[in-house]
Amino acid sequence: MNRSFKGFVLLAALLTFAPQALPEDRSGNHDGLPPRINVRVHNYAQVSTEILAQAEAEAAGILGKAGIEVSWTNCDPTQKDLGDADECNQFLGPTNMAVRILPFLGAIPGTDKKTMGFALGNLASVSIRRVNEEAAEFGVQPYEVLGPAIAHELGHLLLGRKGHSPTGIMRAHWRREDYERAPRGAFNFTAEQARSVRAEVGRRVKEQGTAEVTTATVTK
């Protein structure tokens, strides 16, 4: 599986997340709490509620060990548009990201049949077909692959092209032993990556706050 950051891939896909309203500020670091990112999950693959909840818990645990809190919003693409007030129609921005769970990725330049996902801008995508194939290959549950895959792609959104490492969650390819050692931290960020992720989210929180203050000043 090549989980490499595909910065040039599917730019048009971002158009499906055109901004509809100003983002809700839920990313501040108050009272010593860890910095938070808001992640919308667009479940195009219709993954079951149970598996998705387990996967989100896995991903949140991985990011939590790096010092980042995640607030999830699950968006059902089959539901009718609820308008600008709906969180699923909020801006993507510095601390407001989205993950698409897709049935499959299709033909994407620069990828191969083992590619599980890609990340671009503030949008990450994961193939449930590849998740299920890897789960079957290594004898684990789908959520045990989907959760780390989501965390991996969010890691790319925060770390960029320098994201891959020879160990941990940002490995380009996972092996059977990685899943076997997952309870002992095989899917954690490295210490250096954890510091970089915290610094990047902290920077984004400040950027988000500055943008909102500027917007409020202009609209007075």
Regions found by a protein language model. Name each.
Residues E24-D31, R40-A57, F118-V140, E144-V145, ...:
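Metalloprotease/metallohydrolase-associated module, dominated by Zn2+-dependent proteases
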Residues R26-S27, L33, I37, V70-N74:
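Hydrophobic alpha-helical segments, chiefly the membrane-spanning helices
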Residues T49-L157, G163:
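Metzincin-family zinc-dependent endopeptidase catalytic domain
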Residues G7-L10, L157, A216:
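Short amphipathic alpha-helical "recognition" segments used for binding
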Residues A18, G83, G168-I169:
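Residue-level signature of transmembrane alpha-helix interfaces in integral membrane proteins
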Residues M1-F5:
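N-terminal secretory signal peptides that target proteins for export/translocation
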Residues G7-Q20:
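Bacterial N-terminal signal peptides
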